[in-house]
Amino acid sequence: MKHRETEARLSLHELQARIEATFGERDRARGVDGTFRWWVEEVGEVAKALRARDPAELQHEIGDALAWLTSVANLVGVDLERAASRFVDGCPRCGNSPCTCPGA
């Protein structure tokens, strides 16, 4: 099946459900360690795309890294919306938005 881009927006909860439905069986077979290694590899590809300053490649690689991080979260039972919620009201350290932490 060829990739298609859409303008559809997904909540983190919806993303986790779709990643689970699409890749969950393979992720469980690969295990946490193997899936984590794939995520690390994708983060490396994000770094390469950043250095190349290629917006299309960067979007692609960030999408891949997000999908693999979502797989890791699914395997270890982390709800990404709950994990991200600590940033809703600003910086979790100083409580401000924008952040006013020293050295940040």
Stretches found by the model and what they are:
Residues 1-62, 66-104:
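Flexible "arm" and connector segments at domain edges
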